[in-house]
């Protein structure tokens, strides 16, 4: 009659020796070689500590209805026209002040509670002898991030265009993009730049100089910039028609760079360490089995009787 294996179970064998024996020293050395080298390998392979991470978020952007406009005129008009929403700036312009008609509208296209774009239109009245060759325009915004890094700041969009021929309209369709010189902190509120881009209460002309405003703004580590590589300059203005600036500024989803917190760094490092540790555990487990089974170090082998068998022997 043929015999078949119907059931099997492993027999546990232990190896005993003193704490000061070669076997104990071997186990201590094996443990050190099992757990320390994976840490060194993960650390030396770079990227062990996550110093920078990123995520996507659509910022909460609101137009602050602050405008500063400089329209550059042709040589026959000798100069420029200017206007802003800051009374102190307007008082400094004298005869060069020209008040335009401004209309704005912010739109939430996907109905998620966050505005997606700004429709901005400015009509600057001109005399028949005045011709616009260039435009410098500053619009200010309130800019907020909430998800991982909490940021509140006041930012701006700076538009500058000039052409050799007089224009009737400037059309802009671009994105208000976030620029970072360093990652944001993920802990606490970052309100370093929650200050006005333009000092609208100052009576000094220096504070309204565009070079000063732009230079001070670029000193920030976090800014916004209007990204429109191809503004459209339209020509052919009627004698009594105004010069028109028609702009659509979108608020797109941004990739935000930030410094991860302690537990996120630990989680990222732990995954790398464990993935390498599993290989070392498998290798050294095989080495220890070989060493003790072949008595490379002297020990006393003992076969451990399963608990169920001990109960049977006791009952018998």
Swiss-Prot record:
<dbReference type="GO" id="GO:0043010">
    <property type="term" value="P:camera-type eye development"/>
</dbReference>
<keyword id="KW-0969">Cilium</keyword>
<feature type="glycosylation site" description="N-linked (GlcNAc...) asparagine">
    <location>
        <position position="194"/>
    </location>
</feature>
<dbReference type="GO" id="GO:0036038">
    <property type="term" value="C:MKS complex"/>
</dbReference>
<dbReference type="GO" id="GO:0035869">
    <property type="term" value="C:ciliary transition zone"/>
</dbReference>
<protein>
    <recommendedName>
        <fullName>Transmembrane protein 231</fullName>
    </recommendedName>
</protein>
<dbReference type="Pfam" id="PF10149">
    <property type="entry name" value="TM231"/>
</dbReference>
<feature type="transmembrane region" description="Helical">
    <location>
        <begin position="23"/>
        <end position="43"/>
    </location>
</feature>
<comment type="similarity">
    <text>Belongs to the TMEM231 family.</text>
</comment>
<comment type="function">
    <text>Transmembrane component of the tectonic-like complex, a complex localized at the transition zone of primary cilia and acting as a barrier that prevents diffusion of transmembrane proteins between the cilia and plasma membranes. Required for ciliogenesis and sonic hedgehog/SHH signaling.</text>
</comment>
<keyword id="KW-0325">Glycoprotein</keyword>
<comment type="subunit">
    <text>Part of the tectonic-like complex (also named B9 complex). Interacts with TMEM107.</text>
</comment>
<keyword id="KW-0225">Disease variant</keyword>
<dbReference type="GO" id="GO:0060563">
    <property type="term" value="P:neuroepithelial cell differentiation"/>
</dbReference>
<keyword id="KW-0970">Cilium biogenesis/degradation</keyword>
<dbReference type="GO" id="GO:0060170">
    <property type="term" value="C:ciliary membrane"/>
</dbReference>
<dbReference type="GO" id="GO:0032880">
    <property type="term" value="P:regulation of protein localization"/>
</dbReference>
<dbReference type="GO" id="GO:0001701">
    <property type="term" value="P:in utero embryonic development"/>
</dbReference>
<keyword id="KW-1003">Cell membrane</keyword>
<keyword id="KW-1186">Ciliopathy</keyword>
<feature type="glycosylation site" description="N-linked (GlcNAc...) asparagine">
    <location>
        <position position="221"/>
    </location>
</feature>
<keyword id="KW-0966">Cell projection</keyword>
<keyword id="KW-1133">Transmembrane helix</keyword>
<dbReference type="GO" id="GO:0001944">
    <property type="term" value="P:vasculature development"/>
</dbReference>
<keyword id="KW-0812">Transmembrane</keyword>
<dbReference type="GO" id="GO:0042733">
    <property type="term" value="P:embryonic digit morphogenesis"/>
</dbReference>
<feature type="transmembrane region" description="Helical">
    <location>
        <begin position="262"/>
        <end position="282"/>
    </location>
</feature>
<keyword id="KW-0472">Membrane</keyword>
<dbReference type="GO" id="GO:0060271">
    <property type="term" value="P:cilium assembly"/>
</dbReference>
<keyword id="KW-0979">Joubert syndrome</keyword>
<feature type="glycosylation site" description="N-linked (GlcNAc...) asparagine">
    <location>
        <position position="199"/>
    </location>
</feature>
<dbReference type="InterPro" id="IPR019306">
    <property type="entry name" value="TMEM231"/>
</dbReference>
<dbReference type="GO" id="GO:0007224">
    <property type="term" value="P:smoothened signaling pathway"/>
</dbReference>
<keyword id="KW-0981">Meckel syndrome</keyword>
């Amino acid at each position: 009659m043929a015999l078949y294996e119907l059931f099997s179970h492993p027999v546990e064998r232990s190896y005993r020796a003193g704490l000061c024996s070669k076997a104990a020293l071997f186990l201590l050395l094996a443990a050190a070689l099992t757990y320390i080298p994976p840490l060194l390998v993960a650390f030396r392979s770079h990227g062990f500590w996550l110093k920078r991470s990123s995520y996507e978020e659509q910022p909460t952007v609101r137009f602050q209805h602050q405008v500063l406009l400089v329209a550059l005129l042709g040589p026959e008009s000798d100069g420029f026209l200017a206007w802003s929403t800051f009374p102190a700036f307007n008082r400094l312009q004298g005869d060069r002040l020209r008040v335009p008609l401004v209309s704005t509208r912010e739109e939430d296209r996907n109905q998620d509670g966050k505005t997606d774009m700004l429709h901005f239109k400015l009509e600057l009245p001109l005399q028949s002898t005045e011709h616009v060759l260039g435009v410098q325009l500053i619009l200010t915004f309130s800019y907020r991030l909430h998800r991982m890094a909490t940021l509140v700041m006041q930012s701006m969009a700076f538009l500058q265009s000039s052409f050799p021929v007089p224009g009737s309209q400037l059309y802009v369709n671009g994105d208000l993009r976030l620029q970072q010189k360093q990652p944001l902190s993920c802990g606490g509120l970052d309100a370093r730049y929650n200050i006005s881009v333009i000092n609208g209460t100052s009576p000094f002309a220096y504070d309204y100089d565009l070079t000063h405003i732009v230079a001070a703004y670029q000193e920030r580590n976090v800014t916004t910039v209007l990204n429109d590589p191809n503004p459209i300059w339209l020509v052919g203005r009627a004698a009594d028609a105004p010069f028109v600036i028609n702009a659509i500024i979108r608020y797109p989803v941004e990739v935000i760079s930030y410094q991860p917190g302690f537990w996120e760094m630990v989680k990222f490092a732990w995954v790398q360490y464990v993935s390498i540790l599993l290989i070392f555990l498998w290798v050294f487990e095989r080495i220890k089995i070989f060493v003790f089974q072949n008595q490379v170090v002297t020990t006393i082998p003992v076969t451990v009787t399963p608990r169920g068998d001990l109960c049977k022997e006791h009952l018998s």
